[in-house]
């Protein structure tokens, strides 16, 4: 018999200490990594539930194991909410991650060796959009497209590449692009050569759900997303589609299970269901609107302080600061800001002279600070502190002074009150 009072603290002090230290780190550091966010206690309650015990290979009503009558309800709730939230008529909530959702789409729509047009990783794309170190770059013939001199997607070049290489699939979506993507234009290009349009909206799904960023679901053949990032749910993936055939939906389901995964994580799917319900609340829209406002406010300060922002601004939750002219590397900036309890990630910028392990830029995102309650005033103040650190990157006294300010604002705006 298992006693409910069993706990980690009394049993595994070494593990518990690391967990507690991470809790303190999250409370005492300002999180600006664009792909990170804070999930609600309700989501964590679902993830720590007895649903973690249940194997449920298959789909609701079509399981390979008995005893699935209640987890069927859980998964169907998640499916129905995903469809309602994004205006889809198909949803698969089983992918363990965004990358596995993307793997399923490749598996369902393509054969190894097929040509795919994807955004260049160095211009803001993602590993799964064709990087040579990823399955996508190893199994498929990848043709990259990118951004123009203004820092925006070069649709003329994209169309030219599409007509020249005749890819079977075009990928829209990004991990470090601050503009608005013209999904309709991408579909028009895809249709002109008979290609699939697959959109990975992982970074902007929360903004899309709130109507703050254009919804790709009506335009793409298939859409994937993560359920964390701006959506603020548990770490996981999701596949969506609208207006497709039953044959396509069967292929997608089969590509997830049994094609790429075994049993789904029912405790995580419950967390997804909760997060999707939270995303339907009016306050979620207010939150996403503030995420975008905070990003614009921070960009304003960086520009005023003489820093270059890729594409000159932002229309979503993130932006890239190009440090080439400052003779700084992303690695140096990341480390110095980290010592001030400000967490960012080093990031390549277009035409970056440095390697991906060093880089010449940093990526900044506002979902997590907005979750804490930051508004434009706090966002601008924070951007100013970051510039102070970057202006005096080797001055530990400046870094310590900013760290004190960070600890103070973190105490005033706790993650979990």
From Swiss-Prot:
Localization in the cell: Cytoplasm
Metabolic or biological pathway, per its Swiss-Prot or TrEMBL entry: One-carbon metabolism; tetrahydrofolate interconversion; Amino-acid biosynthesis; glycine biosynthesis; glycine from L-serine: step 1/1
Keywords per UniProt: Acetylation, Amino-acid biosynthesis, Cytoplasm, One-carbon metabolism, Pyridoxal phosphate, Transferase
GO cellular component: cytosol
Domain of life: Bacteria
GO biological process terms held by the UniProt record: glycine biosynthetic process from serine; tetrahydrofolate interconversion
Binding site for (6S)-5,6,7,8-tetrahydrofolate: 121, 125-127, 355-357
Secretion signal span: none
Family to which this protein belongs: Belongs to the SHMT family.
HAMAP family, A to Z: SHMT
Protein's recorded name: Serine hydroxymethyltransferase
Protein's organism: Escherichia coli O157:H7
Gene label: glyA
